[in-house]
Amino acid sequence: MATDITPSSAPQCPDHIVFEHVTKEFRTRSGTVRALDDVSLAIKRGSISAVIGHSGAGKSTLVRLINGLETPTRGRVLVDGTDVSQLSDKAMRPLRADIGMIFQQFNLFGSRTIYDNVAYPLKLAHWKKADEKKRVTELLSFVGLTSKAWDHPDQLSGGQKQRVGIARALATKPSILLADESTSALDPETTADVLSCLLYTSDAADDS
């Protein structure tokens, strides 16, 4: 049976994510650091986009602007036509629920089972227990970790941990999936495996 990874919300805008002349600066003890300088871009729904740059080039900052963890110093970041920086904390919650995030260092809960790690965002979204169980079961099958459901993260390889991260990021059927250097800690073979999983995810769902 195919796993449903289709976004739960319908498209609202052809350009899913838009940066309009975005500059982001940070103040440090040694002065102001400009992480992004007048960045403009548009990402269409259902597309795959990659940001390439050396360490410290502002890649992670760009990602954090999309999900509202950072706000622009100047310019606007729009998601489906909405200026993210103008949203209140309450209005930001449904937006963040529609954005999945895969981290470089996995960010799994070591004291929880693989099942519970994947179920975590569903609990935050107040899914019914039966729906939660069905969804987690589907996702663990999708990433090939059904037999690891009751293991803990320290029992998994790096590639398996990142597969858990992918499953967790897809749990609430987000329309946006952000991956912040999600393969940089993996060996080449495992990297190819994880990227194949992500490409299949994009092909199977109308997400960005």
Regions inferred by a protein language model and the residue ranges of each:
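Pre-NBD coupling/linker segments of ABC/ABC-like ATPases
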Residues: A2-Q12
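ABC family nucleotide-binding domain
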Residues: C13-S202
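A short, hydrophobic C-terminal helix/tail in secreted or cell-surface proteins
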Residues: D203-D207
